[in-house]
Amino acid sequence: MRVVLASNNAKKLVELQRLFAALPIELVTQGSLGIAEAEEPHHTFVENALAKARHAAAEAGCAAIADDSGLCVDALGGAPGVVSAHYATVVLPAADREAQRAVQDAANNALLLDRLQGQADRRASFVSTLVALRHADDPQPLIAFGRWQGEILDAPRGEAGFGYDPLMFIPALGRSVAQMPAEEKSRCSHRALAARDMLALMRAHWLA
């Protein structure tokens, strides 16, 4: 069964492929099929994930899954939230997508640290919402949620991962997300929690 991932993020594809390895599905990015990214005009993760999944399913003519995720910082009223990926406004280099993403990630992290200067409350959560559709007009989307709680560091730690991983410290594990091996992140992350729920939903409703 082919399922289109409504994202062109190569690192997210690798992470989700690892998480969904137990299912008899072929997960491919929409970019590999020539599908442009959908608009994300909504104020909640679930609405944006649904919009992205519906767009990918309509363009590909098959099942689709979308992840809308982000960082929600308590002291900032939940920001950056749904705009986590583009929190900072930057001029991106005319280079490949991964190089652009690295520049954007660095700018986002710098802005977050600036907004939290002098703030004692560093509590935050990584939030992931996964939405899967059998087709674009599927009236019964599968929806799964994951939340990973931690604290924002004063400076980046670690070289692995992407996005805000170097700033997100997990007290229970004693290190930042960017200091974790990929296997550990795949077990513990917000996306892993959502994926486990989605695996159960797919088995029960799509693959039974």
From Swiss-Prot:
Its cofactor is Mg(2+). One of its GO terms (cellular component) is cytosol. GO terms for biological process: nucleotide metabolic process; purine nucleoside triphosphate catabolic process. Its EC number is 3.6.1.66. GO terms for molecular function: dITP diphosphatase activity; ITP diphosphatase activity; metal ion binding; nucleotide binding; ribonucleoside triphosphate phosphatase activity; XTP diphosphatase activity. Homodimer. This is dITP/XTP pyrophosphatase. It comes from Methylibium petroleiphilum (strain ATCC BAA-1232 / LMG 22953 / PM1).
